[in-house]
Amino acid sequence: TSLCASKQRYLVINLQLGLFLTVKEPSGYSEATLESFNSGTNQLFCLIPEGNRYFIAFDNDDYDTVLDVEFAQDVAGARVIAYTKKASNDDNQLWGLVPLPETPGIIATALPSSNVITGTGIGESMEMQPEDPDLNQVFGFLKY
């Protein structure tokens, strides 16, 4: 059973092109969400709230090789996040997103941790390398 099945909030990401789609969020469920960018074919992510931590569960049978990682990364001029893998199975990789105290609102994730791809703006921070799962994949998120 997918971790997303029992959740009410979803983040759709285009893994092939690295483009962000609209967040699917039922009305009346407006606590902390992740905002998306652009458009394209989709992959479904679910946002799982736990206090001040946010979890993204990968729901993709073909993408189950995300590495364990825990680090803080500077993206778009701000130290924004430390995150840790919490659990996994054949279908899901669960990560906790931990905003740092000085975070000005931007969260970015990098998968896996080697050769982190960064840039001076949110566009660069969303860059990814879909053709090679062993290369780092960086997604930019907006937290509010």
UniProtKB/Swiss-Prot annotation:
A molecular function GO annotation: carbohydrate binding
Top-level taxonomic group: Eukaryota
Tissue-wise expression: Stored in spherulous cells in the sponge tissue.
SS bonds (residue pairs): 4-46
Keyword DNA-binding belongs to the record: no
UniProt keywords, alphabetically: Disulfide bond, Lectin
Subunit structure of this chain's protein: Homodimer.
Entry function: Possesses D-galactose binding specificity.
Name of the protein this chain belongs to: Lectin-1
Organism the protein comes from: Axinella polypoides (Yellow-orange branching sponge)
